[in-house]
Amino acid sequence: MITIEQVLEVLKKDHNFRDIINQEYYYYSWTGVTFDHLSYDSRDITPSTLFFAKGAGFKLEFLESAVQAGLGFYVAEKDYQVGIPAILVSDIKQAMSLVAQAFYQHPQDKLKLLAFTGTKGKTTASYFAFNILKQSHKPAMLSTMNTTLDGKTFFKSNLTTPESLDLFRMMAEAVSNGMTHLIMEVSSQAYLTKRVYGLTFDVGVFLNISPDHIGPIEHPTFEDYFYHKRLLLKNSQAVIVNSGMNHFDFVAEEVADKDHDFYGKDSENTVKHSSGFSFKAKGKLAGDYDIQLIGDFNQDNAMAAGLACLRLGASLEDIKKGIAQTSVPGRMEILTQANGAKVFVDYAHNGDSLDKLLQVVTDHQKGKISLILGAPGNKGESRRQDFGHVLNTYPEINVILSTDDPNKEDPLTICQEIASHINRKVRIIIDREEAIKTAMSETTGSSDALVIAGKGADAFQIVNGKRTDYAGDIEVAKKYL
């Protein structure tokens, strides 16, 4: 619960409060009102709800329906004149985050917070950290793939980083469940939309950076994307940074005055020797490690998670056990066909992650390699060109373009755009299950492989803004083994 006096105090302290307006009268203060619920969904309203009118797509009728349901107060950037008092602020997103923190009694102060950012690898690194910390602690986790608030029960996530009202509610639930740590993926969008405004992490990890999420409804430029990624470093007490990442020199200079560790290329903490499902590390994590996820980039993710968890109370033994136990739904999942051919299912959904995935597959499989790939609609349009550029460096790979969350775009048009950037003939099979069935029928020997990229463990297709039924790549592939 929270009183209106407490709400106004939070907003004024952040210099975000403008005024309360009610029937054309202005108020600097208000008393005698208590809220027991926060919401940004006009369908989730009680008379004692404090409602936040947010988003570019917010419509007056949403607020009118909330008033009909008994709403008495709302927070907004303008007065919608619906007959109830409006708490006006300059930035609704900042207001949501800080009011949520106060409403849930600052649950972040009762947890050790670990956050990962990067163009790729956030989910894998989060799973490594979860398995490491659960050896001796009680971690909760918010990831793109799954969320757990009790360390045992997992449910699907809707956003990489939840909206602030949901985020702090989840934190409070984790605290009530006795959790000691929280592992989060923090996207650039989370900072762009201020979902984590006012939040300081104990450890922040920057895994890598490459062009992605650049488009009309995301980041206008790479510079903007890079800047919002780096905000995690500014808002973390200690940081872990990949010395092999693009623009590392800039980032290293930026964090020079912070408590930090570097890992990877030319750093103290690096993989000394690697052989498929094991590696030897030097530096703070020196020792021999077993790992289920093949590929140098997965070993780097393990190193990043290990260094972060070392700062949060994990022992080297915890780190070794956690890394060995980690598998990730939709990340480098491998099936074997009756003829011995391999099927790799992976979430690789941008040019850089696709390149890393294909490097691993071509290193291990020396026969005919096929790839099924698509691109989502209405987001990350730059990926389509990036995919083409990557595939031009693998001329031997047989490419089938298919549907991958087309949203409000025509999947055929998306596939044709990707194909326009590939300098050889490719096939387009719009039905993703048919594409998988066709490709699997063409892998004939134990050295052959099919790579199904983009959706990972997602058991849905996004069409016209809604999730529609789709069994998922791994389940479809199992049908045709």
Curated annotation (Swiss-Prot):
Subcellular location: Cytoplasm
Main location: cytoplasm
GO CC annotation terms, alphabetical: cytoplasm
UniProt record, GO biological process: cell division; cell wall organization; peptidoglycan biosynthetic process; regulation of cell shape
Name by which UniProt lists this protein: UDP-N-acetylmuramoyl-L-alanyl-D-glutamate--L-lysine ligase
Binding-site positions, ATP: G118, T119, K120, G121, K122, T123, T124
Catalytic activity reported: UDP-N-acetyl-alpha-D-muramoyl-L-alanyl-D-glutamate + L-lysine + ATP = UDP-N-acetyl-alpha-D-muramoyl-L-alanyl-gamma-D-glutamyl-L-lysine + ADP + phosphate + H(+)
Pfam family, one: Mur_ligase_M
Keyword hit for Metal-binding: no
EC number: 6.3.2.7
Main function: Catalyzes the addition of L-lysine to the nucleotide precursor UDP-N-acetylmuramoyl-L-alanyl-D-glutamate (UMAG) in the biosynthesis of bacterial cell-wall peptidoglycan.
InterPro entries according to UniProt: Mur-like_cat_sf (IPR036565), Mur_ligase_C (IPR004101), Mur_ligase_C_dom_sf (IPR036615), Mur_ligase_cen (IPR013221), MurE/MurF_N (IPR035911), UDP-N-AcMur-Glu-dNH2Pim_ligase (IPR005761)
Gene Ontology MF annotations: ATP binding; magnesium ion binding; UDP-N-acetylmuramoyl-L-alanyl-D-glutamate-L-lysine ligase activity
Pathway connected to this protein: Cell wall biogenesis; peptidoglycan biosynthesis
Family affiliation: Belongs to the MurCDEF family. MurE subfamily.
UniProt KW Heme keyword: no
Binding sites annotated in the UniProt record for UDP-N-acetyl-alpha-D-muramoyl-L-alanyl-D-glutamate: S42, N158, T160, T161, S187, R195
Keywords: ATP-binding, Cell cycle, Cell division, Cell shape, Cell wall biogenesis/degradation, Cytoplasm, Ligase, Nucleotide-binding, Peptidoglycan synthesis
Post-translational modification: Carboxylation is probably crucial for Mg(2+) binding and, consequently, for the gamma-phosphate positioning of ATP.
Modified residues (N6-carboxylysine): K229
Gene symbol of the encoding locus: murE
